[in-house]
Regions:
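Compositionally biased, disordered extreme N-termini, encompassing classical targeting presequences
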Residues: 1-9, 36, 90-94
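Local sequence-structure signature of Cys/Sec-based thiol-disulfide redox active-site neighborhoods
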Residues: 2-31
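Generic recognition of short, well-ordered alpha-helical segments
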Residues: 22-26, 51, 76
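Short polybasic/polar patches that bind polyanions
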Residues: 33, 54
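Thiol-based oxidoreductase modules, predominantly thioredoxin-like and allied folds used
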Residues: 37-49
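Structural micro-motif
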Residues: 56-65
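Non-catalytic, surface beta->alpha helical segment in thiol-disulfide oxidoreductase systems
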Residues: 66-94
Length: 94
């Protein structure tokens, strides 16, 4: 379909008792209402979470990956993520 956005695969690395992780979940929930995203949450303490964090250079939670590439860690900027999702939408429309 013309103009349809391709879903972005989002992986959120979290840990227990992490207020920044809760903030990131809220940001992703808001943006998921506007953009096609598939969100997977991984515990940073899991073997898969540790491996992904090491691969992506994630120093502390929350870590965010977009389509397998590291996007951010620490406090997630809604503005920065929105700009990136807009950019990806524009590139799929060309």
């Amino acid at each position: 379909m013309t103009g349809q956005m391709v879903a972005v695969e989002v992986v959120l690395l979290t840990q227990n008792h992490c207020s920044l992780c809760e903030h990131a979940k809220q940001v992703l929930d808001r943006l998921a209402a506007e953009y096609p995203v598939r969100i997977t949450t991984l515990d940073l303490a899991s073997s898969e979470g540790r491996a992904l964090a090491a691969h992506g250079g994630i120093l502390f939670p929350p870590g965010v990956f977009l389509d397998g590439e590291p996007f951010s860690y620490g406090r997630l900027s809604e503005r920065k993520l929105r700009r990136e999702l807009d950019r990806r939408h524009q590139s799929t429309r060309r």
